[in-house]
Amino acid sequence: MNWKNFVCSVVCLAGMTCAEAVNYTPENVSASIALKVPGNDAKRYPLTLQQLDNSNFEYQWVAADKLPVVIYQNVEEKDGNQRIVIFMTALDDVYFNFGEQVMTGCHHDDCLFYMPGFWYRRNLRSPQEAPSFHTSDSWLVREDRLSTPLTAIFDEKNRKTYSVIRLDNMASDALTTHKEGEVILSGKTSIGYTGFENLSGIASLSFGFPYKEAPKTYIRKLTLAPSVEAYQLLRKGESLSLTWELHESEIADFSECVQHIWEYSYDTNCPQIVNTPYSPEKMKEVMSNFFVESFVGNTPTHYYSGVELRTATCDQTDVAEVGFVGRTLLNAFNALEYGEQQRRTDLVTNAYKIFDSYLQHCF
């Protein structure tokens, strides 16, 4: 036997994460549907998951009251994961918002959370005016806020990761007349929501359709606004299908959790290169015009004017900023590097003017 290959195999196996299915049972899941008549407050109906026999569907979500919509569900095993497929048919015209929660069995206080591009651990390094545990330990957000429509929960104590990802095609969105509260969509959207919630001390994965954001919505930098919940019209006889996938893995630490989730997301979504009409070289050439049009050289310290820029006129302003938005010195370095590569003496000259002015006059 080739001992070198054997040892390599053992090392590779030791480094692999162990994927297994989330324990999706009626005892671990809950759901509700909110129905709204325009002009009136929505009414939320708790749903119970009932197993079906002699049917094309495994389960049906039912309420204590008769609803103008029927909701069926299948749970499919796929590569060690569980796919949740919802089938919804309207018996009458109805505006709805559907949500589901899957309890992980982990104590919420033992968990860290990850939503790609939006949430890391508990977001405690973010200001109180941004989404974080400073405001709440439970957050639901629109899927299109994230790099991929996924939420992951990492149990530090038991070293396991649980995640939910939306698998439907995100192809459309619709406008609303309001930005908070219960809002009626002007058309059809494909945007749902994802997040995590503390349910009586247990961490749960939460997801649904159409979107909602709670306990706050993050409308702009450092600005939390009241929650929003969208309602989409499903006309009588229309049907809707929604698909999510639940995934569970044994993970050593949170860093490995992030790595694993990204690899899982790529494997699941299989992103393809986007074909664009312009090459990277062409776009860099166009964007480099910023260094020309925004250069201000009639002040003691020279800079690129970009802070508080009015997009309607693109006029230069008298605001210079070294960090955050302005990044004058970083932009000067970028202009210098690009200018030298492209033999653009105008970019190189202005970049050195900025550096020299700061060396002479300081900040």
Q: Which residues fall in each region the model found?
A:
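Bacterial Sec-dependent signal peptides at the C-terminal "C-region" and cleavage site
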Residues: 14-24
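Well-ordered alpha-helical scaffold segments within catalytic/enzyme domains
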Residues: 329-345
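Low-complexity, Ser/Thr/Pro/Gly-enriched N-terminal "stalk/linker" regions
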Residues: 28-31, 40, 234, 238, ...
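Sec-dependent signal peptide recognition
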Residues: 2-9
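Long, charge-dense tracts
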Residues: 241, 247-248
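Beta-strand/loop-rich accessory regions of lumenal/periplasmic or secreted enzymes
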Residues: 23-29, 36-41, 48-236
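Signature of short aromatic-glycine-proline-rich micro-motifs recurring in repeat-based ectodomains
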Residues: 322-329
